[in-house]
Amino acid sequence: MKILQINSVCGIGSTGRIATDLHAILLSQGQQSTIAYGRDAARNCDQTIRIGSKFDNYPHVARTRIFDSHGFGSASATKKLIARIKALNPDVIHLHNLHGYYLHIGLLFDYLKEANKPVVWTLHDCWTFTGHCAHFDYIGCERWRSQCHDCPLKSEYPKSLFLDRSQKNYQQKKALFTGVQKLTIVTPSKWLAGLVKESFLREYPVAVINNGIDLNVFQPTPSDFRQRYNLEDQFILLGVATPWSERKGYQFFLDLAKQLRPDEKIVLVGVSAEQSKALPAGIIGIAKTNSAAELAEIYSTADLFINPTLEEVLGLVNLEALACGTPVVTFNSGGSPECLDANCGLVVERGDLPGLVAAIATVRKVGKAAYSAQCRKRAQDWFDKDARFGEYVELYKAILKS
């Protein structure tokens, strides 16, 4: 098989690493694999197509900020990509994030409909079936069900400073993204699959393939983290996000800090320099790290991982914590609860701070050691990247066979 993946980035960020992990599995099985990507430098992949350049990205950003016309820039770069696709002639075209200031979705989907090749589209958020935003559930917006308009998230990614074009964007996306003859949608969670089936994409078959992680990297890992941060006698509550925002639950950590016991400490990884300066007593802020090995050390050291997300498609950070033997407490939001069972953590109703405090007390009373083996087993049974991304290979084969 010859597979072409298309994503905004390659080898960086969660979706970029998913693409390169899948690329590696395809190569290990003797298949041909190429990744086309739109921004930054490619990592962990030697067979790539760069879509445009930063000089294509910048006008697309401007178009988005001024006209709220995200996904309708980068025309020249997209035409060149289509020429490369024709020359490559892949058996399956696998789409990931098409947002990110690098593609003209109109040109791409006109080509996909004309080419009539099998297409797999992994949705990593909700941008595909809205008129603007990538996430809407955390504010309770329901406009996407019928037609977006008067977008309450116009100032969120992909940010528009002036115009609200959400109604027109919705109409154009619906026209472009429907009617593709051989398209299969994949979502990382049952939650997102449910939304897809209620959207204008409902005509397509939807498969759920959970994200996977590298269990050789994310595993219980000893370190001197406690000593370096003077936390030897502290119960460590860990949070990881990049960037920290309202949706990621940043405010809940600030509120939680006011209710800590004297021997409890919050560690937040991924805080900005500005956020770090404003953190209250009780919270240690650490900048974003691109080192998975360093993250594994921090996950392993923590007594409890807290994910008070208001909306998450699945929650890669949950999986990483579990794989390192650390129990997880998360809100009942999005696909985040799908990561857990009762043996490796607790689920609290979204926004319930007293419930969060009670869950922390419950885990602390039982002790991390009572959870660790089951946390690791949960990750091994359900979120091993080789097994999960191997499901994509089987999906490709089934699609081509049919």
Residue ranges and their predicted role:
Residues 194-197, 213-228, 277-278:
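Acidic anion/phosphate-binding donor-loop and adjacent secondary structure
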Residues 231-248, 254-257:
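Conserved donor-binding/catalytic core segment of Leloir-type glycosyltransferases
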Residues 273-296:
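Nucleotide-activated donor-binding/catalytic signature segment of Leloir-type glycosyltransferases, i.e.
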Residues 277, 332-342, 346-347:
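Short acidic/histidine- and often glycine-rich active-site loop of Leloir-type glycosyltransferases
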Residues 288, 342, 346-353, 362-367:
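Conserved acidic donor-binding segment of nucleotide-sugar-dependent glycosyltransferases
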Residues 297-302:
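Short alpha-helical donor nucleotide-sugar binding micro-motif in glycosyltransferases
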Residues 310:
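Aromatic "clamp/platform" in nucleotide-sugar-dependent glycosyltransferases that forms part
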Residues 327-330:
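Short hydrophobic beta-strand element within catalytic cores of glycosyltransferases
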